[in-house]
A protein has these predicted regions:
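N-terminal leader/auxiliary helical segments
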Residues: 1-214
Length: 214
């Protein structure tokens, strides 16, 4: 899943949310040696969300459909669709988390941006490199529109020529076409399961009792 979904699938805890956001920046397990519980849970939650998404039968089916147009970039396309449809269906999905049940999406994004800004010295890897642009250009709100994910896909393709098919795919996409509807069906079916599974992961985590939830 992409950045917005990772933030929404996090518990309402600043450090866990920040480390989930930047989880891609941590490889292996050596970083865990002296890590605080919140860091361990956040990074491991990030990995859980990604693996749960990648291995879910509904995701595999959706990626197979998108692969016809997006090629090997189908998993990235699905991630971008996830944030777009989370915007589109926020009023339906916000109740999946008690802390967003009555919160407009722009207020949720602003709160997350404030938390990340306060802890941006903790960011690693891709999130660290992208954060200044994400903040200044308000990327997460830009995903509200199909034109926003088209811009994101085009920018990614420009920076990384190996994923050029991603930009071509999204620039040829129209709301309501076959690929759009396949991704929409995937999101509506899958996302509630992801939030539920992420919540259970946090509740069952061995370090849950070591963390202050106040």
């Amino acid at each position: 899943m992409n950045f917005l979904a990772h933030l929404h699938c996090s518990p309402n805890h600043e450090l866990i949310r920040v480390f989930n956001f930047t989880g891609d920046g941590f490889r292996g397990t050596s970083w865990k040696a002296e890590a605080m519980p919140e860091k361990i849970m956040g990074v491991e939650l990030h990995r859980f969300i990604d693996s749960f998404t990648d291995e879910h039968p509904t995701s595999k089916k959706a990626k197979a459909v998108l692969r016809e147009g997006a090629g090997k970039t189908a998993p990235i396309a699905l991630d971008l669709f996830g944030d777009y449809f989370l915007h589109k269906y926020w009023n339906r999905m916000k109740g999946l988390q008690s802390f967003t049940s009555d919160v407009p999406i722009d207020a949720f994004v602003q709160n997350c941006f404030s938390q990340i800004h306060d802890a941006d010295h903790l960011l690693q890897g891709k999130a660290s490199r992208m954060w200044p642009f994400m903040r200044s250009e308000n990327w997460l709100m830009d995903y509200e529109h199909l034109s926003g994910i088209k811009r994101a896909a085009t920018g990614m393709s420009r920076r990384h020529p190996a994923i050029k098919p991603l930009g071509v795919f999204f620039n040829g996409l129209s709301e309501g076409d076959y690929n759009y509807l396949a991704a929409e069906q995937w999101f509506l079916s899958f996302y509630p399961e992801l939030v539920k599974a992420s919540t259970k992961f946090v509740e069952d985590h061995p370090l849950a009792k070591s963390i202050s939830w106040l």
